[in-house]
A protein has these predicted regions:
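Single conserved hydrophobic/aromatic residue that forms the stacking wall/gate
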Residues: 179-188
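C-terminal/domain-terminus segments
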Residues: 130-150
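Aromatic-residue-lined binding/catalytic grooves and analogous aromatic/hydrophobic interfacial grooves
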Residues: 1-6, 43, 144-175
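C-terminal structural cap/anchor segments
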Residues: 48-131
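Short basic/hydrophobic patches in alpha-helices and adjacent helix-turn junctions
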Residues: 36, 118-124, 137, 141
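Flexible, polar/acidic helix-loop-strand segments at domain edges
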Residues: 1-26, 33-39, 50, 54-57, ...
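Structural helix-adjacent loops and short alpha-helical linkers that scaffold large soluble proteins
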Residues: 42-48
Length: 188
């Protein structure tokens, strides 16, 4: 049985209205994309670290908050466990990642990628489509496993939804594409 939405009705919701402007692409995202490109060895015109730090600073500027330099210097803070005040037995979660904020030049390429994508996720809030695309592509940032996976085993609880299922008409009329896509998913 899933968690009932009414259980959390006293919590806040994003403060957006239909008439509000919605961000589609921000400067911080550009910096994080360049950081990832530099990390992969592409000529981005700078280092992964420089673009990563620029992305964090641009995100702070966009939100009109101070403290970016102090934030970037924090080599101690790691993701905290989530303690659900309403349903702790079912919804508490302790992150597996120990990623910090401060850039660590000695870290593995994978850890650096996790750091970049995690900060990109934060900077892009509330653009869920960007976060979902990055998560599908990289597996970062670490997200809570599904509390109520009602897919009958079709969707992995920890890996979660990676792509939308093909409609029946596509399965019946274009099976070659379907098998190619399934093979690509299994290779990831």
């Amino acid at each position: 049985e899933g968690v009932k939405p009414a259980t959390y009705s006293g919590y806040s919701m994003p403060n957006y209205e239909q008439k509000d402007d919605m961000l589609m692409f921000c400067a911080a995202e550009t910096a994080f994309l360049r950081a990832e490109g530099a990390l992969r060895g592409w000529d981005m015109g700078g280092s992964a670290r420089d673009f990563y730090e620029q992305g964090v600073k641009l995100s702070f500027d966009q939100r009109k908050v101070s403290g970016a330099d102090e934030y970037l210097a924090n080599a101690v803070a790691v993701p905290e466990p989530f303690i659900d005040p309403v349903n702790p037995a079912k919804c508490n979660y302790t992150p597996k990642t120990k990623i910090t904020i401060a850039w660590n030049e000695g870290a593995s390429t994978e850890e650096k990628l996790e750091r970049i994508i995690t900060q990109k996720w934060i900077a892009n809030f509330p653009l869920g489509f960007e976060g979902w695309a990055d998560y599908r592509r990289t597996g970062y940032p670490e997200v809570f496993p599904s509390v109520s996976n009602l897919s009958n085993g079709v969707i992995d609880t920890n890996r979660q939804l990676r792509r939308l299922p093909f409609p029946l008409s596509e399965k019946q009329g274009n099976s070659c594409l379907l098998y190619t896509s399934d093979a690509a998913d299994e290779a990831r």
